[in-house]
UniProtKB/Swiss-Prot annotation:
UniProt-recorded name of the protein: tRNA sulfurtransferase
HAMAP family (alphabetical): ThiI
Active site feature: 458 (cysteine persulfide intermediate)
Domain THUMP: 63-167
Gene Ontology MF annotations: ATP binding; CCA tRNA nucleotidyltransferase activity; tRNA binding; tRNA-uracil-4 sulfurtransferase activity
Annotated Gene Ontology cellular component terms: cytosol
Function per UniProt: Catalyzes the ATP-dependent transfer of a sulfur to tRNA to produce 4-thiouridine in position 8 of tRNAs, which functions as a near-UV photosensor. Also catalyzes the transfer of sulfur to the sulfur carrier protein ThiS, forming ThiS-thiocarboxylate. This is a step in the synthesis of thiazole, in the thiamine biosynthesis pathway. The sulfur is donated as persulfide by IscS.
Record's catalysed reaction(s): [ThiI sulfur-carrier protein]-S-sulfanyl-L-cysteine + a uridine in tRNA + 2 reduced [2Fe-2S]-[ferredoxin] + ATP + H(+) = [ThiI sulfur-carrier protein]-L-cysteine + a 4-thiouridine in tRNA + 2 oxidized [2Fe-2S]-[ferredoxin] + AMP + diphosphate; [ThiS sulfur-carrier protein]-C-terminal Gly-Gly-AMP + S-sulfanyl-L-cysteinyl-[cysteine desulfurase] + AH2 = [ThiS sulfur-carrier protein]-C-terminal-Gly-aminoethanethioate + L-cysteinyl-[cysteine desulfurase] + A + AMP + 2 H(+)
Ranges of residues in domain Rhodanese: 406-484
GO biological process, one term: tRNA 4-thiouridine biosynthesis
Annotated gene: thiI
Organism: Shewanella woodyi (strain ATCC 51908 / MS32)
Amino acid sequence: MKFIVKLFPEIMMKSKPVRMRFTKMLETNIRNVLKKVDETAKVKREWDKIMVLVPDDRQDLVEAFAERLACIPGIAHVLQVSESTFESVDDIYQQTLAVYKDELAGKTFCVRVKRVGNHDFRSIEVERYVGGGLNQFTEAAGVRLKNPDMTINLEIDKESLYLVSKRIEGLGGYPMATQEDVLSLISGGFDSGVSSYQFIKRGSRTHYCFFNLGGDQHEIGVKQVAYHLWQKYGESHKVKFISIPFDPVVTEILEKIDNGQMGVILKRMMMRAAAKVARKMGIQALVTGEAMGQVSSQTLTNLSIIDRCTDQLILRPLIAMDKQDIINLSRKIGTEDLSKSIPEYCGVISQRPTVKAVLSKIEAEELKFSEDLIDRVIEAAEVIDIREIATSMDTKITSTETVGDINSGEVIIDVRAPEEEEQSPLEVEGVEVKAIPFFRLATKFADLDKSKTYLLYCDRGVMSKLQALYLQEQGYDNVKVYRP
């Protein structure tokens, strides 16, 4: 069994050297991701596609490979195929009949053929021959070229025949690291998660800069969002997570700044700090989740004034998107439930925000700040490899017990994503196991029996630890981490 990975159309339009570079990078990215599933994963690059081979004795890898290929930037779609050779058009028909005869019963169908190489027949001739044979010698309801119940896809590549059993839509976009790095200002809300995803999809290694205004509980929630985005869509490359303690800045704003100017000035201070961090990391652009008119600081006048605080390029991929469209996309990429549980801190500091700030007034207010304020908070920033999030939390989860044995009455909560849980469900004899995905646990945990102790489980022990800390900060002491 094989997967045929089809390149995103914009890659196909590039010049030969650029297309080759992008395809090589995509091959490397696929290999990096799949080798985390199975070390023996075989990936082969061709001019117009990439082949992923699944050994006949490892069919257990099919679903895992398919799931990960669907989330790698640069892929238009993936075809799950079985490969064989053929001698004639009739041989192609006979092989197709053997595979699809039973499945066609009572259904309308059409046959679609794509062909590469020199043959003594055309693609349409194969479609007619195979379609006519299937219509005559199966119990199909007939041929229907538009909107059939079933489409039989065949790919012919020189002497090879590929019978397509499944088509999996890809993420699109460009392969990771074919574009320059960006630093995304992430708050954990709907907007910043979606804007980060947009640049991952577009091929940029997306690092995360978080301004902590709400303590450890806020930080752990944001780390969950960032880790989820990286693990699902950008796992092929290392990125950094930077946490900047911004409460000293907020304190000075509340004590010294005119109330109406607070929102714009807070954003300008964030941009200044992020720009300094980006320059240290050799990153040219910042990414934010701002959308025009969504809040008072996001009018065109205010955005223009915010931009003037730095010469760093500031990118806003959501600038013209409606809020509901942003929420819908966050649901699609798996961050909606995580973002729902994270409060928005920026909006609470100004009661009468200006929607049309004046630059001279803003600059006059900013003279009230301590001169070294930004440098001090950057100096106190925590910079970690996003893969080390679990390790970094070990020092904070001092009261969370990690257990390998289960006591009577304890309940296991499997916090893995639904597709992972379905692929390899956790079963422990004599123990109740509840499947609650990590992104729903924050809202579902309050409904559980408070008299019981819950053991959180995931494959790597990362999300279970993050969720344990999060729940403990909310006041729950009946939670542990389960590592069998």
